[in-house]
Amino acid sequence: MNEQQLLENIASLAGAINQYKNEKEPTQVLDAAKANKNTRSYPYSVSRNYSFILNKSNRSKSTAASPPYVIPSTSSNADDANKEPEKQSTSDYVSRKNRHMQLIKKNILEHDLQARKANLESYRAKLEKEYKTLAENKIQQRLSDGTKQLVTIDGLQYITGVSDTKWLEFVSAKGQCPKYLYWNNKSYLLKKKRFLKEVGNSPSAVYCRYYNANGICGKGAACRFVHEPTRKTICPKFLNGRCNKAEDCNLSHELDPRRIPACRYFLLGKCNNPNCRYVHIHYSENAPICFEFAKYGFCELGTSCKNQHILQCTDYAMFGSCNNPQCSLYHGAVSADVPEQTEAPISKTAGSINPEDSGSEIGSNSLESNLDFISV
C-alpha cells in the first residue's frame, strides 16, 4: 500500500467518526436537559428509623474472612450450624435510644459513655470553680465597707454585722442552710431564705413551746419553730397513774429525767412512795432553780444538772416578784409543813389530780397546772 492509499483510508475513517458524532449529539443534549430538570434542589433528610452501625475494622476483617453469599441447606444440621453464628453476632450489639433508636456494639457504647462522663465531670468542675470565684468576689465587695464580718460556724460561712449580730446571712458556696443553730451564746432560727434571726439566748429557744407543752401545734408545718417529738413535756396524768390514753396521748409517756421534775416530797425528806415516778435527787441548799427546765420544761443535763428542776418562776424566786401577768408558773415559796406522803398505791382511775395522791404536788403547785405555762 502506497502513501496515497493510506491517506484515503484515514480520510474515510475520519468522516465516519464525524458522522457518528453528529448522529449522537442531539440525544445527549436531551438527556442532559432531562437530567438537569430532575436534579434535587435540597439534600435528602436524615432517616429517623433504625440505623445500623458497624465497626469499620471489624467489618473489613469479617468481610474478608467470610464469603458474601451463604448457600441454603435443606438439612436440619445445616440450619443449626447457621443459627449459632447469628446468635453470637447479634449478642455483640445493644440498642441505644438517644435522638434515634440505634443498634451499636457494646465496646463502642462503653467508650462513648466513658467519654461523655469524663466531659460532664470536667464541665461541672469548671462551673463549680467559676461559681466559687464569683461568690468570693461578692463576699469581698460586701465586706469592703467594714460594717460586716464573715464568720464560720460548723464549717459554713455567714455574714453578720460587726456590732449587731441579730441576723446571720448564709453565704457558703457548699452545703445547705440549716434551719436553726446556736452560736456565740445565741440561738438563731431560719426566718427567710438564707437569713437566720436571733430568737433567744437558750439552745431551747428554737423549739416550739406550744408543741412541747401540748403535743400538737395549730400552725403545723407552717410553724417556723422546730417541732421535736423528743422534747414533748411528760404527761402529768401519767406521772400520777391517771392517764388512760396510752399511745393516743399527745404528750410523752417516757420516763426521761431530762423532762421530769424533782419530787418535792423527796427534797423535804418525806416521800414514802416506792412507786413515785418523780426524780429523787439531792440538791445543795443554795442551788438556784434551773431556768431551762422552768421555762422550757426540758434540760439537756438531766440529773447531772446542779440547779433544781422545779417548775417555779425563776424571776419570783430570785427577785421576789414577776413582771409577766400571764406567767402560770408557781410563785409561792415551798412550805416546810408539807405532810408526809402515804404509801397508798397509785390510783388508775381517770380524773383530775388529787393533791393527796402519791407523787402529786400540792395546792397551786400541782404538776398539771405548772406544766401548762406556755405563753408567747
Curated annotation (Swiss-Prot):
Annotated keywords: Coiled coil, Metal-binding, Nucleus, Repeat, Zinc, Zinc-finger
Alphabetical GO biological process terms: nuclear mRNA surveillance of meiosis-specific transcripts; nuclear mRNA surveillance of spliceosomal pre-mRNA splicing
Glycoprotein as UniProt keyword: no
Entry-linked SMART domains: ZnF_C3H1
Coiled coil segments of this chain: 2-25, 105-140
Biased composition (Polar residues): 349-369
InterPro entries in the cross-refs: Znf_CCCH, Znf_CCCH_sf
Keyword Zinc (UniProt): yes
Region Disordered, residue ranges: 60-95, 347-376
Gene Ontology molecular functions: zinc ion binding
Compartments it resides in: Nucleus
GO CC terms, sorted: chromatin; MTREC complex; nuclear body; nucleus
Zinc fingers classed as C3H1-type: ranges: 202-228, 229-256, 257-283, 284-312
Biased composition annotated in UniProt, kind: Basic and acidic residues: 80-89
PANTHER family registered for this protein in UniProt: CCCH ZINGC FINGER, ZINC FINGER CCCH DOMAIN-CONTAINING PROTEIN 3
UniProt protein name: Zinc finger CCCH domain-containing protein C337.12
Species assigned in the record: Schizosaccharomyces pombe (strain 972 / ATCC 24843) (Fission yeast)
